[in-house]
Amino acid sequence: MKVRASVKTMCEKCKIVKRNGVVRNICTNPKHKQRQG
């Protein structure tokens, strides 16, 4: 899980999702997991 100021998709399978006011990146590749913070 990477915590970043700007969350961007890293591949074509990445999805940007907003959960409880937190922007997250979800992907099949665990290295692409991101959260805005």
Curated annotation (Swiss-Prot):
Keyword Transmembrane helix: no
Key words, A-Z: Ribonucleoprotein, Ribosomal protein
Alphabetical list of SUPFAM superfamilies matching this protein: Ribosomal protein L36 (SSF57840)
GO CC annotations, alphabetized: cytoplasm; ribonucleoprotein complex; ribosome
Biological-process GO terms, alphabetical: translation
Record bears the keyword Transport: no
GO MF annotation list: structural constituent of ribosome
NCBIfam families, A to Z: rpmJ_bact
HAMAP family from the UniProt entry: Ribosomal_bL36
Family of this protein: Belongs to the bacterial ribosomal protein bL36 family.
Protein name: Large ribosomal subunit protein bL36
Upper classification of the organism: Bacteria, Bacillati, Chloroflexota, Dehalococcoidia, Dehalococcoidales
